[in-house]
Amino acid sequence: MTNIRKTHPLMKIVNNAFIDLPAPSNISSWWNFGSLLGVCLILQILTGLFLAMHYTSDTMTAFSSVTHICRDVNYGWIIRYMHANGASMFFICLFMHVGRGLYYGSYTFLETWNIGVILLFTVMATAFVGYVLPWGQMSFWGATVITNLLSAIPYIGTNLVEWIWGGFSVDKATLTRFFAFHFILPFIIAALAMVHLLFLHETGSNNPTGIPSDADKIPFHPYYTIKDILGALLLTLFLMLLVLFSPDLLGDPDNYTPANPLNTPPHIKPEWYFLFAYAILRSIPNKLGGVLALVSSILILILMPLLHTSKQRSMMFRPFSQCLFWILVADLLTLTWIGGQPVEYPFITIGQLASILYFLIILVLMPVTSTIENNLLKW
């Protein structure tokens, strides 16, 4: 009798994706983040669903409803903090996943990479609209500042902003539609993730060496299922440590003050995972220029396959490129720090230098270094 998992139309898909999938035998823990992102997404959808049962998307009651969830709903506080800190975990995994792709040259899988970039944008959009929902001071002013950036678009900018707001300022209409977006986007992310996986399974996984591994494949189950379960357990441990010991560590105290359009907080800043992009935005004194730099800082990822000049796929055997990669990581950490600092000397200058270095490394230094390394191979 044939195994049902190999014949049943639905089970066959699951089998080919998670059980009998041929996987390289040497993929390291850096390949765990894909499955961890799946775990994060499921966790966010489930906690979000339970929060939505008690949340009201009205300017008069939104803040109170979040307070009600934390104080009166059974285990509401843990659901709320798992959702808020789950977003931080999501972004940590995302950054690691993208970093892995850059380091090991996974961007040469064009379709997979491009859908990944679209996924990154979608997750960022979801996190942004979600941050507005508690309707605290930082929610309100964050929404005002970031949506206002669209007014920098020539000719249609102002109309576009008012269309998104549903009025002449961030108000009830804005909050209601942001809740609608925040509810629908995770399901779009789930669908995109499936397409991401579909394209990945067309080519098979990359591996740390960047060399084709067709000659040395092992079944995904049990080898990588057990490895992914370990990763998921560690992720859960780290998340629950955060939730149970310092749930507000990554949040902004200003968001515990109800939104007040008449009182601007001294330092408007987004959540930590947007700070690097926010620093790039602020480092350019011109509004449109800042917006373009902000979008380019993420959109630049699409250019990675075009900027790859090396004869080798992975950075594993390219020490100079490795140095540049880690300088880029340090630069992004510097930008994240600057994004949370007030706009004054010396932070402005550091931010501008770090922003220039970011684009310089990706657009100039990395391709040039790769070419030099190609020539060194001839020696």
Curated annotation (Swiss-Prot):
PROSITE patterns: CYTB_CTER (PS51003), CYTB_NTER (PS51002). Keywords: Electron transport, Heme, Iron, Membrane, Metal-binding, Mitochondrion, Mitochondrion inner membrane, Respiratory chain, Transmembrane, Transmembrane helix, Transport, Ubiquinone. It is found in: Mitochondrion inner membrane. GO terms for molecular function: metal ion binding; ubiquinol-cytochrome-c reductase activity. Its cofactor is heme b. The chain crosses the membrane at residues 33-53, 77-98, 113-133, 178-198, 226-246, 288-308, 320-340, 347-367. This is Cytochrome b. It comes from Alces alces cameloides (Ussuri moose). Gene3D superfamilies: Cytochrome Bc1 Complex, Chain C (1.20.810.10). Belongs to the cytochrome b family. Heme b b562 binds at residues 83, 182. It is a multi-pass membrane protein. InterPro entries: Cyt_b/b6_C, Cyt_b/b6_C_sf, Cyt_b/b6_N, Cytb/b6-like_sf, Cytochrome_b, Cytochrome_b_C_euk/bac, Cytochrome_b_N_euk/bac, Di-haem_cyt_TM. Pfam families: Cytochrom_B_C (PF00032), Cytochrome_B (PF00033). SUPFAM superfamilies: a domain/subunit of cytochrome bc1 complex (Ubiquinol-cytochrome c reductase) (SSF81648), Transmembrane di-heme cytochromes (SSF81342). Heme b b566 binds at residues 97, 196. The cytochrome bc1 complex contains 11 subunits: 3 respiratory subunits (MT-CYB, CYC1 and UQCRFS1), 2 core proteins (UQCRC1 and UQCRC2) and 6 low-molecular weight proteins (UQCRH/QCR6, UQCRB/QCR7, UQCRQ/QCR8, UQCR10/QCR9, UQCR11/QCR10 and a cleavage product of UQCRFS1). This cytochrome bc1 complex then forms a dimer. Binds 2 heme b groups non-covalently. Heme 1 (or BL or b562) is low-potential and absorbs at about 562 nm, and heme 2 (or BH or b566) is high-potential and absorbs at about 566 nm. Component of the ubiquinol-cytochrome c reductase complex (complex III or cytochrome b-c1 complex) that is part of the mitochondrial respiratory chain. The b-c1 complex mediates electron transfer from ubiquinol to cytochrome c. Contributes to the generation of a proton gradient across the mitochondrial membrane that is then used for ATP synthesis. One of its GO terms (cellular component) is respiratory chain complex III. GO terms for biological process: mitochondrial electron transport, ubiquinol to cytochrome c. Its main location: mitochondrion.
